[in-house]
């Protein structure tokens, strides 16, 4: 997808895509709860798709204030530990339980290209307004939501993303 402009999902686009992935559309789009769950996690945690797909049950740790993920970012090699909302933790744990996923196993045993391919099929079916949506749009959606809910605080988003500068975050 190099060279292609990716935009953040709007709230409406996010809801429509996730609903379509969970429910499917007749014979055109088969339901795919796994991909829907992957994108929900990306949009609610702000991870890159590769980092989302590398999550294991053992990535979760109990902290005095709740739960956190321990990951090493694929792109940067940076070690990250960050708090996860209880609702997100429970959502992901319920998914892992329903799929019979053990501690050391990947929660989402699927490749990045497979997720991108299925998302593109859904976006192509949804039509105009969805052509610039990719898996990265869900990470951007997370940042956009944080930005507006916190008084347009770009520095907060930069810190959450662990970007080197606000200019990188704003791009």
Each predicted region: which residue ranges?
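Basic, Lys/Arg- and aromatic-enriched nucleic-acid-binding interface segment
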Residues: 7, 11-45
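Conserved tyrosine-mediated DNA breakage-rejoining catalytic core shared by Y-recombinases
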Residues: 54-89
């Amino acid at each position: 997808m190099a060279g292609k402009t990716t935009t953040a999902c709007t709230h409406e686009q996010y809801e429509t895509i996730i609903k379509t992935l969970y429910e499917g559309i007749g014979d055109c789009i088969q339901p795919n709860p796994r991909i829907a769950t992957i994108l929900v996690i990306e949009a609610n945690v702000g991870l890159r798709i590769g980092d989302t797909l590398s999550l294991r049950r053992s990535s979760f740790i109990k902290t005095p204030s709740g739960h956190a993920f321990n990951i090493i970012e694929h792109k940067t090699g940076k070690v990250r530990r960050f708090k996860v909302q209880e609702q997100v933790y429970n959502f992901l744990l319920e998914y892992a339980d329903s799929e019979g996923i053990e501690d050391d196993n990947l929660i989402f045993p699927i490749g990045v290209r497979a997720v991108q391919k299925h998302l593109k099929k859904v976006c192509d079916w949804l039509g105009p307004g969805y052509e610039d949506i990719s898996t990265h749009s869900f990470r951007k959606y997370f940042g956009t939501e944080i930005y507006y809910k916190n008084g347009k605080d770009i520095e907060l988003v930069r810190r959450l993303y662990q970007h080197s500068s606000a200019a990188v975050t704003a791009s």
